[in-house]
């Protein structure tokens, strides 16, 4: 655990209406360069002890060195999964897979007019970033996995959900365990 005395604990204010989260406001400070450098050193030291590495980028500055971390992990033969953030995915190049949600994917590649257009845009992004795969979570439309050998679409089972917080985290964690155990992508 890295401690940065200059950083206060993030406080998250959630605004709820009719049992659903309407918005969240975060009060926080950015970690120092020294703390981030120490985190990178700790990551490198612990890397041999894992089979897969999961990065959830919340855009808060904690993954400033993610490009280097991905490079180190892949060089060590590790599976690297990234839940991305923002509109520039170049820093995730070389990961095994990234898992943007539908709106994050649109932010990066633009709108698509149909499934064929989405497949084309996903293939272009996957190739540009040298990824093995790209998984787009699509809310009520399920999820779509894009690999060099084609696309796989998994439909969603509709449910009334009051708070979708953590849904993407659940997807990437499940995928990490499956891939670390040698499961086939299609499973």
Give residue spans per PLM region.
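Active-site donor-binding loop signature of nucleotide-sugar glycosyltransferases
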Residues: 18, 27, 100, 156-157
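Buried hydrophobic positions in well-ordered alpha/beta secondary-structure cores of metabolic enzymes
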Residues: 13, 53-56, 143, 168, ...
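Conserved phosphate/ATP/ADP-binding segment of small-molecule kinases
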Residues: 52, 60-151
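Short glycine-centered, acidic/aromatic-flanked micro-motifs in structured strand/loop junctions
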Residues: 27-29, 55-58, 177
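A short, flexible beta-alpha/helix-coil linker loop
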Residues: 21-22, 29-30, 104-106, 159-160
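Short, charged, surface-exposed secondary-structure boundary motifs
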Residues: 10-12, 92, 107-110, 161-165
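Conserved post-catalytic alpha-helical subdomain immediately downstream of the catalytic base
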Residues: 132-133, 157-187
């Amino acid at each position: 655990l890295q401690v940065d005395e200059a950083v206060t604990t993030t406080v998250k204010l959630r605004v709820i209406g009719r049992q659903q989260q309407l918005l969240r406001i975060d009060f926080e400070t950015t970690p120092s360069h020294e703390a981030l450098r120490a985190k990178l050193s700790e990551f490198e030291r612990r890397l041999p002890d894992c089979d897969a590495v999961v990065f959830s980028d919340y855009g808060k500055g904690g993954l400033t060195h993610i490009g280097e971390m991905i490079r180190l992990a892949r060089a060590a033969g590790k599976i690297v999964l990234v839940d991305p953030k923002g509109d520039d995915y170049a820093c995730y190049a070389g990961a095994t897979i990234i898992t943007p949600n539908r709106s994050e994917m649109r932010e990066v590649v633009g709108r698509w007019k149909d499934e064929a257009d989405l497949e084309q845009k996903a293939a272009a992004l996957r190739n540009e970033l040298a990824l093995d795969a790209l998984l787009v979570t699509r809310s009520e439309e399920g999820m779509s996995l894009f690999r060099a050998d084609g696309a796989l679409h998994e439909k969603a089972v509709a449910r009334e959900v009051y708070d979708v917080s953590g849904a993407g985290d659940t997807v990437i964690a499940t995928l990490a365990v499956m891939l670390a155990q040698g499961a086939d992508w299609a499973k």
